[in-house]
């Protein structure tokens, strides 16, 4: 399964410090479009959270054994590059948290819309 991703810096008034949050999405959506949508949604609906800069962007694949590989850069964000090792670690952590809540990447992959 190959998808696009961005890692965005979030800061919450309720939580301590800043957090790097990976967001995975379908290849049909531009990196900038996803960032703009997330940023707008938080400005409108969550006044306790500030969406900061995009720290990295690119493409991600997750193989059948759960290995995460990140690469590339975003043209729509002006060449923001992926951070392969760090981003793979963040996404692996996200994947492990999903697995602990009975939602896993293999299930999502098997039910992904055509063309993603």
How should these model regions be labeled?
Residues 1-88, 92-116:
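Intrinsic low-complexity, intrinsically disordered or marginally ordered coil/linker segments
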């Amino acid at each position: 399964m190959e998808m696009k991703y961005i890692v965005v810096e979030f800061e919450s008034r309720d939580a301590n410090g800043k957090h790097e949050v990976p967001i995975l999405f379908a290849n049909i959506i531009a990196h900038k479009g996803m960032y703009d949508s997330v940023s707008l949604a938080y400005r409108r609906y969550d006044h306790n959270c500030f969406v900061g800069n995009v720290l990295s962007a690119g493409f991600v694949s997750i193989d059948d054994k759960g290995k995460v590989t990140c690469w590339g850069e975003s043209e729509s964000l002006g060449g923001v590059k992926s951070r392969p090792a760090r981003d793979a670690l963040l996404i692996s952590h996200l994947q492990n948290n999903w697995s602990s809540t009975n939602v896993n990447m293999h299930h999502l992959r098997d039910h992904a819309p055509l063309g993603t």
